[in-house]
Amino acid sequence: MKHTLFAGILATTAMTTAAMAEDTVTAVHAFPESLIYTKSFLEFVDKVNEAGKGVVQIEVRGGPEAIGMFQQPDAVRAGVVDMVYTPGSFYAGALPEKDALVASNLTAVETRANGGIALIDEIHQEKMGVKYLGWFDSGVCYNLWTRDAPTLDAGGNLDVTGLKLRGNAVYNAFFTEYLGAQVIDLPTTEVYSALERGVVDATGWTQIGLIDLKWNEFLNYRIEPCFFSTDLGTIVNLEKWNSLSEESRTILQDVAIAHEAESSAKLGAVRDEDFAKLEEAGMEVITLEGDAAEAYLAAATQNTWDRMKGLMAESPQGDGNYDKLIELFYKK
C-alpha cells in the first residue's frame, strides 16, 4: 500500500512538473481569420503546437477584435501579449528599417540565407525590445486596383487625377510623392464599406486576398507592374523570448524558418489561382510598359528608401545600417 501511494505521488509530481515545464506563448494576429495571411499564421501556430507538444504551445487570443491592429505592436512590446503577427508598417514610427522589407525584391528564404533577417532581428531587439522571429508570406507584391478604367497620359504614365485612393503607411510615400495622389487613410477592416459607399474607388493591395476581403465586388481593374513586397512578420516580446527554455526557442525558430519557405511557395500558387478567378469574373489588367513601367517601379523603390533613410537619421541609432539593408534586401 505504501509503495502504491508513493508511486502515485511520484507520478503526480512528474505530471505537475511536466505541465509546469511546458512554455505557453500568447499570440494575436493583425487581420481577420478569413484572410489568407491570417490562415498562414494559424498554420504556423499549428506546426509549432504539433512540434512543441510538452515543450511549448502558442495560445491564440484572436485578431483585431481582441486588440486593435494598430495597437498590437505596442501590446507585444509592453508584454500584454507575447507574440504578434503583423505588417512591419504598423510600427514604422518605432522601426523605419522595416522599409527594407517593403522595398525588397527578394524573399525571406534569400534574406535569411544572406544575413538580412538576422540584421532585422538585431534592430528589432535594440529598438523595440522584441524578437523578430520570421518574415512570413514573402514574395507577394502589391498592385493598384481601381473601380474604373485607369487613365494613362501621352507617355503611358498612370494619371491618378480624380481618383479617391485609399492609402496606408505601406505605400503612401509612393502614392503621394510620385503619383501625386490625394490619399484617404483607412484600415483594412473599413475598406469594404468605403468602396461600397463610394468613399474610395481605388486602393493598393497585395496580389492575393482581394477575394477573401470581397473587394472584387467593387474593383474591376488591376494595374501592372506590381510593386513592393509584403512585410508580414512575427515578433515576440524579448523578455518573454529570453524566459523560454532553450528547447522552446529552438522549436519556435526552426518552425518559423521552415514556414518562411513553405508560406512563400504556397502563396505564389494562391496568387496564380486568384488572378485566374478574378480575370474569369471580368477583371481587366492594365499594364504600364517601357519607360513608364520602369519609372513607376523605380519611384516606388526610391521613395521608400528615401523615407527609410530620413526616419533612420532622426533616430538615436542613426542611419548607419541604411546601405547594408539595401544590399541585403534588394538585388540590383
Residues covered by each model-derived region:
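Bacterial N-terminal signal peptides that target proteins for export
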Residues: 1-6
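A gly/proline- and charged-residue-enriched helix-loop-helix capping module
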Residues: 107-127
